[in-house]
Design a protein with these regions (language model features):
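Short, low-complexity N-terminal intrinsically disordered segments enriched in polar/charged residues
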Residues: 25-70, 74, 78-85, 226-229
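A short alpha-helix capping/helix-coil boundary motif
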Residues: 14, 37-39, 149-150
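Low-complexity, intrinsically disordered terminal/linker segments enriched in charged
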Residues: 138, 143-177, 181-236
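Short solvent-exposed beta->alpha transition segments
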Residues: 46, 53, 69-148
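Bacterial N-terminal signal peptides that target proteins for export
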Residues: 2-12
Length: 236
């Protein structure tokens, strides 16, 4: 929590810098040359990039400590939080027919959720989808376990790609005026895009591909990794 406070404090300082810079750019200081304004803008962008790097490192450290999922809420966007809540409800109630119509990354997340639910792997009843995506063997680990390229920052948007193709973003971030937050909702499709190519080559449906990937990952740990996961887990 102390580290989160430090990040917020640094964010406030950067926000103040942005405000002062905008005042200078509005004509309040007409004598400021264009080159000086550009230099000031670049300095702010560099500060925001450093803060983004530190925020991401702190998020990964928080995940590694295995803390409660709600400890990760300050690191993700509000839109991502609502999306995860909705996706958890889908996992609890949506039928095979409806689930099959969803994009691949959501099908994979829902089926993995149902596997965890069936095997009683969840340690909490809150923010379970967030826990699932960020936990060991979760979707986020597909990229965080690989060498990553330098961070890119452009105004209020940030991104991170793989080291071998740093200009192709796989994780997105949003600046919310005081801090950086990970845009999980729009990052997950980018992370799983490479996996989808497997299904295209083999001419599989999204559900067939999801079953294949889950069976490959968990076949030595659990049984019945099959189409039964396309339907909600019985509460009985």
């Amino acid at each position: 929590m102390h580290n989160v406070k430090d990040i917020i404090l640094k964010s406030l300082l950067i926000t103040l810098s942005i405000f002062l810079w905008s005042c200078a750019s509005s004509g309040a200081i007409d004598k400021t040359s264009a080159s000086e304004k550009t230099e000031s803008y670049q300095m702010i962008q560099e500060e925001k990039q450093l803060l983004l790097e530190n925020t991401f490192k702190e998020m990964l450290a928080t995940i590694k400590r295995g803390v409660a999922p709600d400890s990760l809420l300050p690191y993700i966007t509000e839109e991502s939080r609502y999306w995860l809540d909705d996706l958890e409800q889908v996992a609890l109630s949506e039928s095979k027919e409806m689930l099959s119509e969803r994009p691949f990354h959501e099908i994979l997340a829902v089926m993995m959720f149902r596997l965890y639910q069936r095997e009683n792997l969840f340690k909490t009843d809150q923010y379970r989808m967030l826990y699932l995506i960020t936990a060991k063997k979760g979707v986020l680990e597909l990229v965080t376990s690989l060498p990553l390229g330098p961070f890119e920052v452009k105004n209020d948007r940030g991104s991170l790609g793989l080291a071998k193709s740093p200009k192709v973003p796989v994780i997105l971030f949003v600046w919310d005026d005081i801090s950086w937050r990970m845009d999980l909702k729009n990052s997950i499709p980018l992370i799983t895009k490479g996996l989808e190519s497997i299904g295209v080559k083999k001419k599989w449906s999204n559900t067939e591909l999801a079953i294949y990937l889950l069976e490959k990952e968990f076949r030595y740990d659990y049984r019945d990794i099959d189409e039964s996961l396309l339907n909600p887990v019985s509460s009985i």
